[in-house]
């Protein structure tokens, strides 16, 4: 058994351990406060919530429709589907920062005469890459409408009070039948980092040294935590 640790790990862990909130409560609070309440505070109109498939699963694991409607959100729509323009309402996007999601958001504001929504609040599950950020910066109409831009660091499903699911259907196959170009361990590590960010934890990392899979995930997780 091996361990990665940082000098700040114990201090951060002791501070967060005082909290009695469950993981599920932390995720729910983060979504309600950092996403919906934040957008509501900057919007004078009713809002439309637009989510990609992954964001929809993340939200559905902790938040009900009543919670959403309480925040002046009148409609919930899927990003990938054809949607009716509602230029009198503000759009709240909660999506993963994939190329597909970014391209769809840009398409919503590609026609200056027919913008999909009024003002825009952009919330991303994970950090936006430099390449995707550059594409957003070049979209002048979209830029003029952005009132919120935030990366909330939630990339897992909080299905129970203190357990979570990474929602990776092909994970086992990719890890066991790994090719030299496989990124599975880095993706898993990145998702685990969002769990720690949600809990405000900086953990000690213990792993089975004889397992190359465990070593790779532990090393990647450690690197992303300290970066």
List where the protein language model places each region:
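Extended, well-folded catalytic/binding cores that form a central cleft or groove in large enzyme
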Residues: 1-227
